A protein has these predicted regions:
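Phosphate/nucleotide-binding beta-alpha loop and adjacent structural elements of enzyme active sites
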Residues: 1-149
Length: 149
């Protein structure tokens, strides 16, 4: 809806599959269908499933299904998308997996800015990964960080 309201339908590609660190089938969980409150997660590791299940609202209409996930590097290799100059990562917990799945992009980018919503339990790991790939934190506010190269 936002794409149409902002007249971006010729400039935006909607890919409804989840991003992760590789090309894999796994479970996608969602327990809230209010806009901005999806609380959705593509679960790749078993211990992630246990942790995520604790946060599910027991009265919710929890749904899950098996779906294909892929990495940003997969999409770039297959020429599904062009190299971005600006990216936003706001995915309810798979930030680290998405970053790991974008290693080629991040290592080889000359110019790139990323706005990322950070979870406290992965903040240090995300910082280490992005720093190793040559990005520098330029702004830190609330649960969001901006990194650039």
């Amino acid at each position: 809806k936002n794409v149409m309201l902002n007249f971006l339908h010729n400039n935006v590609k909607i890919i409804s599959n989840p991003l992760c660190n590789n090309f894999t089938f796994s479970k996608f969980y969602q327990n809230d269908f209010l806009p901005g409150e999806a609380k959705a997660r593509f679960i790749i590791k078993k211990n992630d499933l246990e942790e995520f299940s604790k946060n599910f609202n027991q009265k919710s209409n929890e749904v899950f299904y098996n779906t294909l996930g892929f990495s940003l590097d997969n999409l770039l290799e297959k020429k599904v998308i062009n190299k971005p100059d600006l990216s936003k990562i706001d995915v309810d917990g798979n930030e680290l997996e998405i970053i790991k799945g974008a290693r080629n992009l991040l290592n080889n980018a000359n110019k790139l800015t990323i706005l990322i919503e950070i979870r406290h339990d992965t903040k240090n790991q995300i910082s280490e990964e992005l720093t190793k790939m040559g990005l520098h934190k330029i702004l830190d506010f609330s649960d969001n960080e901006i990194w650039a190269k």
